[in-house]
Each structure stands twice: as structure tokens, then as C-alpha cells.
Amino acid sequence: MQIPKYENKPFKPPRRVGSNKYTQLKPTATAVTTAPISKAKVTVNLKRSISAGPTLNLAKKPNNLSSNENTRYFTIMYRKPTTKKHKTWSGDGYATLKASSDKLCFYNEAGKFLGSSMLPSDSDSLFETLFKAGSNEVQLDYELKENAEIRSAKEALSQNMGNPNPPTTSTTETVPSTKNDGGKYQMPLSQLFSLNTVKRFKSVTKQTNEHMTTVPKTSQNSKAKKYYPVFDVNKIDNPIVMNKNAAAEVDVIVDPLLGKFLRPHQREGVKFMYDCLMGLARPTIENPDIDCTTKSLVLENDSDISGCLLADDMGLGKTLMSITLIWTLIRQTPFASKVSCSQSGIPLTGLCKKILVVCPVTLIGNWKREFGKWLNLSRIGVLTLSSRNSPDMDKMAVRNFLKVQRTYQVLIIGYEKLLSVSEELEKNKHLIDMLVCDEGHRLKNGASKILNTLKSLDIRRKLLLTGTPIQNDLNEFFTIIDFINPGILGSFASFKRRFIIPITRARDTANRYNEELLEKGEERSKEMIEITKRFILRRTNAILEKYLPPKTDIILFCKPYSQQILAFKDILQGARLDFGRLTFSSSLGLITLLKKVCNSPGLVGSDPYYKSHIKDTQSQDSYSRSLNSGKLRVLMTLLEGIRKGTKEKVVVVSNYTQTLDIIENLMNMAGMSHCRLDGSIPAKQRDSIVTSFNRNPAIFGFLLSAKSGGVGLNLVGASRLILFDNDWNPSVDLQAMSRIHRDGQKKPCFIYRLVTTGCIDEKILQRQLMKNSLSQKFLGDSEMRNKESSNDDLFNKEDLKDLFSVHTDTKSNTHDLICSCDGLGEEIEYPETNQQQNTVELRKRSTTTWTSALDLQKKMNEAATNDDAKKSQYIRQCLVHYKHIDPARQDELFDEVITDSFTDLKDSITFAFVKPGEICLREQ
């Protein structure tokens, strides 16, 4: 309305309607038209709102809901103005633009008008321009082109702006039908601004449930909001659709950004983990060869399960599978009605908002790189605590991570750092939706502070990743399982009574012929397998054969030096062993000392067991001067052959830093460039060392400590690895050997294991070959285990005594146990034996009521012979597909490096087992 310039004149009262002194204005197309006030009277052109009379509409809100086909529709994002560095949008909505106008009108997702803004002068920058609309900043997202999208936008806007119900306060006034001669509607100025309020009718009776109309359920359901998944399954090639329960409202579909990279076993793994964390029962799959990942099955709930143990072998992509699961749960949820959704019914948030990843400190950088590699850190916020932070800074960072919603979704923290920030995590534990524990076998100790801290957080959804969760201790197995799914195995007392005692008795060599105990142990084992297979997934790296380059495994038996033989004899005589009281624990120090002699006699003098129990000064001096050994000679010859004969890099692994010191000195003397990673290297430097080795072609070797640095590292820059010594725990060696043969490797790989012939090295190797039987049994490697392999402890006290014997008259004690071939490089086929039948027969005969002394002695001899035969059978099964090679008869070892070096090594290598890698085409 235009107000005339004020003039100081005497007051004149306004004239009544009907006066002929009003000024007539020509009607226009606008909703409200006013005329300048002349002599305190106004002429107004009114728009009829009802047929009873003219109305005046003072609302200036633009209405772009007309059926004009020239109107363009856009989706928008809006927010309040902010000075934050990382800005986020607070909501979505629509914008309309009429062809006859240069003004954009903005609405939120509910159709509420936000404001309008003029078009920018440069039409090319339309979608980059930040518009000002009321108190909001608005940016166009994209223009709606599809008819269905435009129709949906019109419906969303009309729900609010086209509401037929009258508002409680009306801005439209009904004017009496009073006409003058000219057909104009006129009113005094005072009446123009005194608007009446239309009040809603209020019933005099109180409305109760009895008076309310009952709406049929079918009608209610028809009006219920429909929800849709984040991704359209029809637009994705080979989608991964998660299973669901009956209460699910939408399908959860893996983001194709990640799904297109997943291999078949990884697709199955992601779906298995999702089922476990969502508490779904395992589906019944009739044909496991059929791909079921593209279909969503409706499963029943399993209230006992809320966690998962992914126990795949190293190199199968556990990290990628975990990242896929994390991203899926952050972005999506099957229960759309419980989260905020877009106006089209698509969930805007996922089931999990904050996820805690706990791992060894050496893997923190690797986890963050993997998130960046697969998702890009602009899509997901990943927080890692800097090693330069003070404890207070770490606590503040954790506090902010939990309380600030949109900046970070994932916190990656080391196991040790977890203890220092446990108080902050405990205070806000209700905000943590999911826990991921990498290298989860570190939690096998029930008294561990780290384990108790994680338990106190009481996070329902848990995912544990490990390559070797169990070896031969059911107590540790219970600790891990009870942490993942508390109470699923009952209390420890009941678990011990029902499972540990029967299974342990069945594995005791003293009860090997007791049919009743063995049957009960087998029954309990099967029962435990049925329970744990609901949430444990275990696959071997045999799956990788068609994805990775071929790998050749070579076991080299190295002849000990004479100085080493003398050291063995002196130590065993000086130890004065009492084999009657000998146990594995009491002899552990002596075992470690003998292992050092296998590496180099020069390590004897600094050994604590040698100093406290033997301490022969004269012998110690002679040992310290003798640094060489059979394995060191073979090692240096191999390194020289690799450097001169190939352009490849090599990793050398040992369990002892003192051994690495000796190897490092020898490499320096030979002019071999190298880097080293062991427990003394600060965590913040480890990633840079690994990256430098993988990328710098000038670095030839990498010295690696198996225990402190052999977990989770990616050393694909090397294609050859030499395992210098063995560990009692086969998982340590397997972890170390898998550093090079993994995703990202482009060259054929060669793994060399060095073993001192006839010494404790061989005994450890034999135990490693058989120690996996319990893991294979409870983790489902059924195709790799013999039914009898888990019924016995493979080493008893007699075997322990044999550890301290040195066989100087053999080329390979291991080969002597399993085979009598000539070592001509052939792969030996072993016929099926009737060993199991003989064992059952001995059991039946041992359960008779009375036995004479002569028969007892005869049965004991038969039992001893049977035990040796069983041990040989187990080792043969572990060495299947290996070729037996005697260097004196055959000089082809299926590796050009060692074959070319045979001239120098014929006197140092006594025997070899070789498993050649088959050429596998990498799946495109």
C-alpha cells in the first residue's frame, strides 16, 4: 500500500462508503491492489474469496502451485548461516521458478514457505550460488525432470499451502456487498485495518472415545506413510540385499560404491555379519553354491546373538568387509519409521551413528587409509588420536567425538590408548552403537584390563576380527565367545562342566582307548560347534587362489655347524634334566635357549637361562666368537641370489631382535640396503617405514620382528619372504608369512622356511603342522581335518623328551617320519590306511574287564606303534601336495634363485619340501 507524504493539515473525518470522491483504480492480476490515499479515503479493488461478497487478502506469500506447465521445480538444501569450518545442511526442500518471473521461491520439505530470492545474473552458476531466503542460506541441488518427481513435489507443497481447513487467525475479511454506481467495492480506511478474527467452532460437549468415529484398520493403513530403501535395487547390477525380520519396513542394500568391489566370499561375509549384528537366525541354505546375496530372506530373530566373530584367514579382506558393514549401518536402517526420513520416505540416517574401532597401534594408520581408499574421507568422518596429543587432549577429542553428531562417525583407537580414555567412553557409552575389535584374539585373557574395559562399555553390537582365535585352550575360547555374545555358553562353571572337561578328557592320551570318554567328548564337541557356528565365520585362504598370483612354499632343512652340535651337547649336559618331573612350562627357558643355538651360537652368552643354570665361561667365550650357523649361511646365499638374479624385494622375519641384529650386520657388510621394524620402533614411524619400503625401489630388504610387527602389515612391495625361525604358536608365523601374499600383490610369491636339521627347529615345525587341529575343528575347516585329529593331544611327555634330542645322522627327521622315498622331486600319493579301524579295535580290547601282564605289555607296544603311525599320518596330511627333494639326487627346487644357488648350498641344505604355486588367472 502506498502512503502519501504527510502534510500538516486540519483533521477531517473519513467519509462513509458510497461517497463519490474515491479514486478508482484499474483492477490488476495481483492478489492485493491499493490506491494512494486522497482526502483520507481509499478505493480498493478486492478479490472474491467466497460468493457471498468481496474479500480482501493481505497475504503476500507467493503461490507457485498453479497448474502452469512452465513452472520449473528444483530440490534444495538449506541451513542457518554459520561460521563453522565444516558446514552441514540442516534440511531439504523444494524451489519453484515460473517462466514469467526471475524470482525463486523456496519451501522446506513440508511445503512451508522459506523465502524467495532473485535469480543470479549468470545462469551457469545457478547451482553454485548460495541464496539468501529469510534467515536461511539455500543452495539448489538439482532440477526435477521426471513427471513422477514433479508430481511428488507438487503434492508435498500442496499439503501445506493448499490446506482447505481455515486457519485460526484469518487474513481475509468478508466485506458487505455494497456497490456504488460505478460498481466499485469501497470501505473506509479504519475498517481496512480492523480485521475480524474467525474463531473455530468449539463443541459444548466434551469429546470422548465413545463419541469418536472408529476408522477401519484398512483405512488407517492406506494412509500410512510409505518408506523406500536408500538404493533402488532395480538400478544396481548384482546388488547385495540384506536379510530382515518381519518387522522391517524397508530393504537394506549395500552401497554399490563398495558392492561392486566385493568378491563372492566377501559378499557372503558382509551379509553374515549383518545377520549376526541384527540378531537374525541363520537361514537354511540347501545349495551353498547358489548365490543368495542378491535376495533378502525374512528370518526369525535370535535373541542370543548380537555379535559376530569373523575368523577368516589372513588376506581374505576382513577390513574391507568390516568397512562395508560399517558404512551400511551408518547410512541405512530397516526401521525407517524410527529415524528421520525425506519427504519421499527414504531414511536420512542409519541404525548406527557412532562406531568404535579398536586395533593394535600399528594398524591405526592402515584402517584410516582403507576408509579413505574405499569410501573417501569426505563421505565418512574418521577420527584417530594423534600420538603427539597429551592425555587431556585425547580425552577432549573422545568427548567431542561422542557429543558432536555430524563431524565424525568412526573413532579408531589402539588397545593401549583405550585404557587412558576409558573414563570418557564410560560416561557416554550409550552413544556408541557398535564396536569393532581387530586382532580380537588379544582379548583371550579374561583378566585383561583391556577386555574388562570393553565389557564395561556394554556395547550391544560387537564385531571381532581375527585370523586365529583359538589354538588349544577352551578357556580362552570361552572368554572370547562370552565377550561377543554374553551368556550364550552359560556361566564358566557350567561351560567347564559340560564342554571343557569331557573334551579335554577325550583328548588326553591316557584315555585314547576309552570308548565311552571319546564318544562323550565327540558329542560335546559337535554340540559346541552347533552353538558357535551361528555367529562364527571361518574361511581359509584357499579361496584366494583364483584372485592372487601363485605362491610357492619351500621348507629348507639346513645342516647345523659343528660348533652348534657342540653347543647342544654342552647345554643338555649342563642342564641336568630330570625327565621324570619335566613339564613344558618348566623347560620353556631351555627350549628358548636351544632355539637360539639353531639361529646362531653367538646368542647363547646373553641368554638368561644359560647364565642362571649353566654358566660355563670357557664355552661361553667360544660361542660368542662363533656367529655363523647353517641357517645364516643359507640365508645370506639366498639374499645374494635374489639381489643378483631378480629385481624383487625380500622380507626377512625372525622372532628375536637379537637375531635381527646379527642379520642386519651381515646385510650391512654385504652392502644390502634395508629397513627394519620391531618393537623398538615408535608407532608413529611404522607407517612411514612400510610406505617407504613399498614405494622406494632402492630398498632391497625389510627386517621384521614377527611378534611386534608381523600383524596386519601390508608389504606387497616384496614378493619373497624368508622365515628365519619358528614360533610355538603357528598363528605368529602364518601372520608373518601372509604379509606379502595378499591383495595388491602383482608378482608370484616365494615363501622360504629355514629349519635346522635334526634339532629343536624340526620338533617345533612338526608341532606346528598338527597344532591347528582344534582350531580347524571349532571354526569349521571340516574339509581340512581328519575326524580323529582332534581326539588326541599330539605331543605327550615322551614327545617333550624328544625335543631335547639331536639327530645328527638324518637328512630330515620330518621326512623320516612320514616317507621312505628317495627324494627325487615327486609328489607322493599316500594310500588310505586302516588306522581308524585299528584305533577302534584297540579301544574295544582295552575296555575288557581283566588283562594279564603279558597281554597288557603287548597292548602297550601296539599302542606305542599306533601312536607313531597316527603322528606320521597327521604330518603327511599337513604336507600334502609338497614335493620331496633330496639335493644330493635332485637339484630342481622349482625356484630359479635357489636352483642357481645349489652349487654353493649343496653342503648346507640336506632336504627340502616344495609346494609349487599353480598359475592362477586373476579375476577381472
From Swiss-Prot:
A motif (DEGH box) lies at residues 472-475. Its EC number is 5.99.1.-, 3.6.4.12. Residues 168-178 have a biased composition (Low complexity). Residues 299-487 form the Helicase ATP-binding domain. Residues 1-21, 155-183 are annotated as: Disordered. Keywords: ATP-binding, DNA damage, DNA recombination, DNA repair, DNA-binding, Helicase, Hydrolase, Isomerase, Isopeptide bond, Meiosis, Nucleotide-binding, Nucleus, Topoisomerase, Ubl conjugation. It holds the Pfam family SNF2-rel_dom. It comes from the Eukaryota. GO terms for molecular function: ATP binding; ATP hydrolysis activity; DNA binding; DNA topoisomerase activity; DNA translocase activity; helicase activity. Residues 631-790 form the Helicase C-terminal domain. It catalyses: ATP + H2O = ADP + phosphate + H(+). GO terms for cellular component: nucleus. ATP binds at residues 346-353. InterPro entries: Helicase_ATP-bd, Helicase_C-like, P-loop_NTPase, SNF2-like_sf, SNF2/RAD54-like_C, SNF2_N, SNF2_RAD54_helicase_repair. The keyword Hydrolase applies. GO terms for biological process: double-strand break repair via homologous recombination; reciprocal meiotic recombination. There is a cross-link at residue 615 (Glycyl lysine isopeptide (Lys-Gly) (interchain with G-Cter in ubiquitin)). It is found in: Nucleus. Interacts with RAD51 and DMC1. Involved in the recombinational repair of double-strand breaks (DSB) in DNA during mitosis and meiosis. Has DNA dependent ATPase activity. Promotes D-loop (displacement loop) formation with RAD51 recombinase. Modifies the topology of double-stranded DNA during the D-loop reaction to facilitate the invasion of the homologous duplex molecule by the initiating single-stranded DNA substrate. Required for adaptation from G2/M checkpoint arrest induced by a double strand break, by participating in monitoring the extent of single-stranded DNA produced by resection of DNA ends. Belongs to the SNF2/RAD54 helicase family. This is DNA repair and recombination protein RDH54. It comes from Saccharomyces cerevisiae (strain RM11-1a).
